[in-house]
């Protein structure tokens, strides 16, 4: 988990803008205590900030924001197939200075732009500034959060809502639809958040911000949609041994790609089937030992996961 924050304004940055950016990064320090950095261009009106939690390639070379040619990135998440991407485009990429996924994502975007999503398998939220456009995006299912707010002079974004609420003095709104969603689901569906002029980037979506005639121009596009056949009602039949084998292979592949790390890994182990199955496959199929953590609440037996 890292934290990103930034803004792209239709005017030149002034010193107070930079101070606001630094202050917001401090509010996100808990998301990335290993390193903090920012990059800005006063003339272009762009500020990108990043708080880092080091997982892959913990060296300083992997610090962010990271720049390559005319492309700068501030990124939170993990690209599980970054090694495959690195091999696939080895003839297109210049020599790598790091062993992490950030540089792979950065160079992939520099090469393919919005077509980069076709290559990605992972959880991510990132901001990319290229030439005179800012791109904000999150992963296919919105696992990594990214909030944004549009003002008269530009667009602001953050991994968490609080820096934007505090900086822009955003107010709660009393909306029936939002209230119902929160009561039923425990959250409000994106892009809404319950605050005025505060939005959450939707899954499989990218936002492009550009400056035209001294005004900020915003567009939003879906980069992926699930196959319509997923929602069709299929014929019910018993599970076959082939089905079970296929699911097992998919699970093992999915788990193994998520265990690439240069720091110790841990597993939240509940009394449920899913985490127990993951722990079992890690040990028996991948032959890896992993520390497991189970949560117990003394006064809340409903959420007591200690009985495994």
Language-model features, listed with the residues they occupy:
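Cysteine-centered catalytic environments shared across enzyme families
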Residues: 1-308
């Amino acid at each position: 988990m890292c934290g990103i924050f930034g803004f792209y304004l239709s005017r030149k940055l002034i010193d107070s803008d930079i101070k606001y950016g630094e202050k917001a990064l401090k509010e996100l320090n808990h998301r990335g205590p290993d390193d903090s950095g920012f990059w800005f261009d006063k003339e272009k009106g762009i500020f990108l900030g990043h708080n880092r939690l080091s997982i892959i390639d913990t060296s300083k070379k992997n610090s962010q924001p990271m720049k390559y040619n005319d492309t700068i990135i501030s990124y939170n998440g993990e690209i599980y197939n970054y090694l495959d991407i690195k091999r696939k485009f080895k003839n297109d990429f210049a020599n790598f200075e790091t062993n992490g996924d950030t540089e792979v994502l950065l160079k992939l975007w520099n090469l393919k732009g919005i077509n980069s999503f076709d290559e990605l398998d992972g959880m991510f939220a990132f901001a990319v500034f290229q030439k005179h456009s800012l791109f904000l995006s999150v992963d296919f299912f919105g696992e990594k959060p990214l909030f944004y707010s549009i003002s008269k002079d530009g667009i602001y974004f953050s991994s968490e809502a609080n820096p934007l609420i505090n900086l822009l003095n955003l107010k709660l709104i009393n909306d029936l639809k939002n209230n119902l969603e929160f009561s039923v689901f425990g959250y409000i569906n994106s892009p809404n958040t319950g605050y005025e002029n505060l939005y959450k980037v939707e899954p499989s979506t990218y936002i492009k911000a550009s400056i035209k005639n001294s005004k900020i121009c915003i567009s939003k596009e879906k980069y992926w949609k699930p196959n319509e056949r997923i929602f069709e009602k299929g014929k019910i039949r018993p599970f076959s041994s082939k089905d079970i084998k296929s699911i097992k292979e998919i699970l093992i592949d999915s788990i193994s790609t998520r265990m690439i790390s240069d720091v110790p890994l841990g597993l939240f182990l509940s009394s449920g089937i899913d985490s127990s199955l993951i722990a079992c496959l890690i040990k028996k199929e991948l032959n890896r030992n992993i520390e497991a953590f189970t949560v117990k609440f003394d006064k809340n037996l409903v959420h007591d996961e200690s009985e495994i």
